[in-house]
């Protein structure tokens, strides 16, 4: 089916009738959340998915905590007013570290967050050096340091915060090539270490989109660890045990916050991920 572009004032075309399915919102500031959505969809292909991305305020890594909390709650509320939700996944590490309490207080449906996969990385490392690749905001958050103290206190944690990697991942999904030299420059602090990390936590949902390029630049044998599969399993459990009975027969839909040329360029990509329409969400 051809992907359809719609503004908020355009009525959504009727979806092909199907069995009612639980409705799951996957939210990110950009397109990185598609990496999490893809893991969930592999495990749970028969759900009604809504993907929302905040291309007005992207990237969140440079925004204040207060702004992020208010913004995420506002967007989730706007989606919930259109589709009763069974569950929401905040597929953004930066937003997850600050907005989950407010979301869980406001909404009755379960809210799943994304946290850096430090615990499994600490188990996998052979040389005891674990790299955390994230946004600068995630690197600085007390929550991240609490995870390290709890699960990786016997490891050396090399943290690297980068907003540029987020931009590179977004550009790649728009069809641009990724400069390996640029990646080497960003990763230089690790590449210059006498003993670089043998296990790297991808602490931003954008970074799995750069997996192939990162493996070309990092030392041979480096393991890359992310939270996608664990989030999918958690989503499945919550839908079975705790989620409200909010079902829909509608087709999957994506929401942006502004219908920009960049958003329009995402149409073929969103189609490949199974979203039939892209609409502007008025917030």
Swiss-Prot record:
Keywords recorded for this protein, A-Z: Cell shape, Cell wall biogenesis/degradation, Isomerase, Peptidoglycan synthesis
Q: What is its EC number?
A: 5.1.1.3
Question: Which InterPro entries does the record match to this protein?
Answer: Asp/Glu/hydantoin_racemase, Asp/Glu_race, Asp/Glu_racemase_AS_1, Asp/Glu_racemase_AS_2, Glu_race
UniProt keyword annotation of Transferase present = no
Q: What domain of life does the UniProt record list for this protein's source? A: Bacteria
Where along the chain is substrate bound? 28-29, 60-61, 93-94, 205-206
Q: According to its UniProt record, which residues of this chain constitute the active site? A: 92 (proton donor/acceptor), 204 (proton donor/acceptor)
MF terms (GO), sorted A to Z: glutamate racemase activity
One Pfam family named in its UniProt record: Asp_Glu_race
Q: Can the keyword Aminoacyl-tRNA synthetase be found in this entry's annotation? A: no
Instruction: Give the pathway listed in the UniProt entry for this protein.
Output: Cell wall biogenesis; peptidoglycan biosynthesis
Q: Which GO terms describe its biological process?
A: cell wall organization; peptidoglycan biosynthetic process; regulation of cell shape
- Where does the record place a coiled coil? none
**Catalysed reactions, semicolon-separated:** L-glutamate = D-glutamate
The record ties this protein, via NCBIfam families, to:
glut_race, PRK00865.1-1
Give the UniProt family note.
Answer: Belongs to the aspartate/glutamate racemases family.
UniProt function note: Provides the (R)-glutamate required for cell wall biosynthesis.
> Which protein, by its recorded name, is this?
Glutamate racemase
- Lineage, top ranks: Bacteria, Pseudomonadati, Pseudomonadota, Gammaproteobacteria, Enterobacterales
């Amino acid at each position: 089916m051809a992907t359809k572009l719609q503004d908020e004032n355009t009525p959504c075309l009727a979806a092909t009738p199907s069995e009612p399915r639980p409705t799951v919102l996957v939210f990110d500031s950009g397109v990185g959340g598609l990496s999490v959505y893809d893991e969930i969809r592999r495990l749970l292909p028969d759900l009604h998915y809504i993907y929302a991305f905040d291309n007005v305020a992207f990237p969140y890594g440079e925004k204040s905590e207060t702004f992020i909390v208010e913004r995420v709650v506002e967007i989730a509320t706007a989606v919930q007013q259109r589709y009763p939700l069974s569950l929401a996944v905040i597929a953004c590490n930066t937003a997850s570290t600050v907005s989950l309490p407010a979301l869980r207080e406001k909404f009755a449906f379960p809210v799943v967050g994304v946290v850096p996969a430090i615990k499994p990385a600490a188990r996998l490392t052979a040389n005891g050096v674990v790299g955390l690749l994230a946004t600068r905001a995630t690197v600085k958050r007390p929550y991240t340091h609490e995870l390290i103290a709890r699960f990786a206190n016997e490891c050396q944690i090399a943290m690297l915060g980068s907003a540029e990697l987020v931009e590179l991942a977004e550009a790649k999904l728009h069809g641009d090539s990724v400069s390996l030299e640029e990646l080497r420059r960003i990763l230089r602090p690790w590449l210059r270490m006498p003993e670089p990390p043998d296990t790297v936590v991808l602490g931003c949902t954008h970074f799995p989109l750069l997996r192939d390029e990162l493996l070309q630049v990092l030392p041979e044998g480096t393991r890359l660890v992310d939270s996608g599969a664990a989030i999918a399993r958690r989503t499945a459990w919550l839908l079975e045990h705790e989620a409200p009975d909010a079902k829909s027969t509608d087709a999957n839909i994506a929401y942006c916050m502004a219908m920009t040329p960049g958003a329009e360029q995402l149409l073929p990509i969103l189609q490949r991920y199974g979203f039939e329409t892209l609409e502007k969400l008025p917030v």
